[in-house]
Amino acid sequence: MKRIKIFDTTLRDGEQSPGCSMNLPEKIEMAKQLEKLGVDIIEAGFAIASPMDHKSVQAIAGAVTNCTVASLARCTKGDIDAAWDAVKEAKHPRIHVFLATSEIHMKYKLQMSPEQVLQRISDMVSYAKSFCDDIEFSAEDASRSDWAFLAQCYSNAVAAGATTLNVPDTVGYSTPAEMAELITYLRQNVTGVENVDISVHCHNDLGMAVANSLACVKAGATQIECTVNGIGERAGNASLEEIVMALHTRRDFYDAETNINTKQIYRSSKLLSTITGVPIPPSKAIVGANAFAHESGIHQHGVIANAQTYEIMNSMDVGIPQNTMVLGKHSGKHALREKLISMGYELTDEELESVFTRFKVLADKKKNITGSDIEALVLHRRNTAIGSCRLISHVVNAGDGVPNTSCIKLQREDDVMEEVAIGSGPLDASFKAINRMLGLDIKLDSFSLNAVTDGEDAIGEAVVKLEDANGRRYTGTGLSTDIIESSIRAYVNGINKMMEATA
């Protein structure tokens, strides 16, 4: 059975998706979770893009030890220098260089001839190789390139020292049959291809990124580039969880396996959703709320009789928590720790203390606390630690015939501040009070509220997108059984992220 490497680009290509930006602590937390998940390569960012990107790649390179850490770079010495400087302290560094090879890109974007492109590939792959043994070369827009020319580009890259050849379907144009045929052609026509990995990077513009990637595995690809939850530019990238579980569930067909710990899939998906504020669609394969739900009476009867009648996977295989043990206000820290361990969470004493404090607050409001409630507390634990502003209390007055008024009390470092404001509703009044208190000029770009657990006393997760005076956007999330409180907490969380980014 052949081994397929999983190249995760959530922190680079995925983060380019609108609304999916992350700050440095969030990127590091996500990288550590990807390491637990068992991905082979983490593409940490595009080091030359900005000082913050460089800092993020550098920090991730120092934070993980089991994964290869890659930085993207164009085929220029400046990009390659920046990439190497960012990943050089990684235990397993990789430089990922790319250059477009399709006629339309060469003519209109690069303004280079095919001969110049071939020479640039040879020169820059060789230059990258002078720093690092592990070099990946991507031919941007490969799926729309002339195949014979593409094979020559890859042959030049191998001769110059590339160890991985990536074949991107950059605009999501190809079909599974076409991608498989292209991989077969390259395996037969690239000089030295037997000594390198063949990778694929498929976009989802026509909804075929996962199907295209899997077709390439059948054709001989040995690495798949993907993102958690399929996030990415435009319609997104190939979804990691779908790729991995397709290979896992259909080993009989693909004769392939990965190094992924599938029990960490759901946790990785939820963490990313919590960080970015982008909800997981209920019908999302593998990790959606309805992925293992059965409402039809015929289906329910079949599952009760034998789960395999309608289920090809077990929810526990992807780490979806089981609500078999409930905790309450009399449960102690030891019981909480044991529950967390059974769910796959190993927290430090400091992290456990933070979660336990909020667990006791929740237990006073909610009779039975399930695994889903606890998971929500764990995933949101960072929000209480980010930034200098903390919500102390809120009082709102709203109703027909009375002004919508909110009194907010915040603590900022050692100062306690209080402000009252009137608005068009209780949330508008609350947000205005916070803005006035802190002297901020920010705009609420979007707001959403979702129940993250079940029941009439469900925990609500509020997500706000804030925009500052310079057009920069920040995502804030908040958690509470009180939807007003969760919304205010989300707003404060977003402000803290903004203050941290502009400090």
Regions flagged by a language model, labelled:
Residues I4-I6, Q16-I41, H54-A63, K77-I198, ...:
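Alpha/beta enzyme core
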Residues E15-P18, H105-K107, N166, I224-C226, ...:
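Short small-residue beta-strand/loop micro-motif enriched in glycine and branched aliphatics
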Residues R473-T475, L479-A503:
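Mixed-charge, glycine-accented linear interaction segment located at domain edges/termini
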Residues R3-I4, T10, M245, R251-V420, ...:
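A mid-to-C-terminal "edge-of-domain" accessory segment
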Residues H394-N404, E413-D415, A421-T475, T481:
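A conserved regulatory-domain signal marking ACT and ACT-like small-molecule sensing domains
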Residues S174, A180-A305:
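Catalytic alpha/beta core domains of metabolic enzymes, predominantly
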Residues L11, F46-A47, L72-C75, L99-T101, ...:
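Short, ordered loop/turn segments at secondary-structure junctions
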